[in-house]
A protein has these predicted regions:
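Transmembrane-helix motifs of polytopic, lipid-linked glycan transferases
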Residues: 2-18, 201-205
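Membrane-interface micro-motifs in multi-pass membrane enzymes
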Residues: 4-5, 22-65, 83-88, 92, ...
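Membrane-interface transmembrane helices that cradle and orient dolichyl/undecaprenyl
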Residues: 57-71, 105-108
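Perimembrane helix-loop-helix junctions
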Residues: 91-126
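Luminal/periplasmic active-site loops of membrane-embedded glycosylation enzymes
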Residues: 144-179
Length: 218
């Protein structure tokens, strides 16, 4: 499982264009030490299967970002990774969004090109979900109600804004507002400092590069 996750980290580094030694060290460390990843190893008899799902998710992102027609194998990888664990689609989306953010930070980047990349990633994700839903219902038409599995593919558009805001709220609560009891005070302080420092550095970068003036006109 660790070997597969290490390979997944290589896909992430390549997809995001990170070439420094620091990135090569920190990205695998973050992937292996993230809380959900650590909990994965509490079920050692399934760890290798979940690691395959993570590898497929990261490989899908790599195909999508690296090649013009990479969305084709990318869709295949995302469908297969959802077949192992649906939540790994969120991992792929997170890496894709991070890639778009890094693209915007490049001095030679054009907002129109980044926007097209974002649309491409969104469409690929939607197609992957549709293909996975169709295949899963063909193979197992009587889906059970575990965690709302029988409602998969059904989305109330009216509730969508609230669901998106709730997702951000949960992330903020996990790291800052309402951390779990197993998170020590020191870890909580480090989380808060890291979030504030990241926000400050991003704002300072945009101000220094004056993106607020010309990012939409380049």
């Amino acid at each position: 499982a660790i070997v597969l996750i290490s390979a997944a980290a290589c896909f992430v580094l390549s997809a995001l264009g990170l070439k420094s030694i620091t990135s090569a060290v920190l990205v695998p460390l973050m992937m292996l030490s993230f809380p959900s990843m650590c909990s994965l190893f509490t079920f050692m008899f399934t760890a290798d299967c979940y690691a395959v799902g993570i590898l497929l998710s990261c490989a899908g992102v790599w195909f999508i970002r690296k090649y013009k027609y990479g969305f084709l194998p990318g869709i295949v990888c995302l469908v297969l990774c959802m077949g192992i664990y649906q939540a790994y689609l969120c991992l792929a989306l997170g890496i894709l969004v991070t890639g778009l953010f890094l693209d915007m930070l490049e001095e030679s980047s054009k907002a129109s090109l980044v926007f097209r990349k974002g649309i491409k990633a969104f469409v690929v994700a939607c197609v992957s979900v549709v293909v996975y839903t169709v295949i899963s219902r063909m193979i197992y038409p009587q889906l059970d109600a575990y965690n709302g599995l029988d409602q998969m593919g059904k989305l109330d558009l009216i509730r969508l804004p609230r669901l998106i805001l709730r997702s951000y709220k949960w992330v903020a609560e996990y790291f800052i507002l309402k951390p779990f009891s197993f998170i020590s005070g020191t870890a909580w302080v480090l989380n808060v400092v890291s979030c504030l420092l990241t926000a400050a550095l991003v704002i300072a970068f945009f101000i220094k590069k004056k993106y607020y003036r010309n990012v939409w006109t380049t």
